[in-house]
């Protein structure tokens, strides 16, 4: 197995590219990220590690703009993400200068996925150890979009999805609870999904909301705490209702 294990461009006899599978494992060990598409907004939420006491929290952002109308969150290796984000931003700017129009969300998703795929079959490089969630608004139709890419270069569109640590649990939660929502309800669904795996509440969650009119806005910690408190109150009320004795008719 060792021969196929080391060579990035060589398939194993049973059809595996082990370096790509190892990159997918790096994603599975990364912090959880979730994206939810609403009718008038799109929300990205990520699990963030506790920062050191003297660290500037503003320097640790996991949700970033690629363009005024497109944002990205990722799970996996942060250094790999920095390289991919910079390449994507340059492509967005180049497209504006060349075509004199902003990129569509699908266009930049295809570009990022193509770059990830290229690094699975080129010598002297290794696959990107990250999966991305890309959200934005189409500059022509104004409709919100959510896409995911993975280290193999595969991409697909979603109504809601998760990647990173315990992504299967989050995805199951979204499948059970997703419905077309708007405004604050979309934000609440994304945070509820993250709370399935984040045990420390709102302090270890980063959330950003994108709307067509206002672009991307990072939620303040106090806003996240207020929504988490609202979710906890709803859970407590639901539990109390279950335990309450049935009323006589």
Swiss-Prot record:
Highest taxon of source: Eukaryota
Presence of the UniProt keyword Heme in the record: no
Any matching Pfam family: Proteasome_A_N
UniProt keyword list: Cytoplasm, Nucleus, Proteasome
Subcellular localization(s) per the UniProt record: Cytoplasm; Nucleus
PROSITE patterns, sorted: PROTEASOME_ALPHA_1 (PS00388), PROTEASOME_ALPHA_2 (PS51475)
Summary of subunit composition and partner proteins: The 26S proteasome consists of a 20S proteasome core and two 19S regulatory subunits. The 20S proteasome core is composed of 28 subunits that are arranged in four stacked rings, resulting in a barrel-shaped structure. The two end rings are each formed by seven alpha subunits, and the two central rings are each formed by seven beta subunits. The catalytic chamber with the active sites is on the inside of the barrel.
Family from the record: Belongs to the peptidase T1A family.
Name of the protein: Proteasome subunit alpha type-7
Species the sequence originates in: Cicer arietinum (Chickpea)
Protein's gene: PAD1
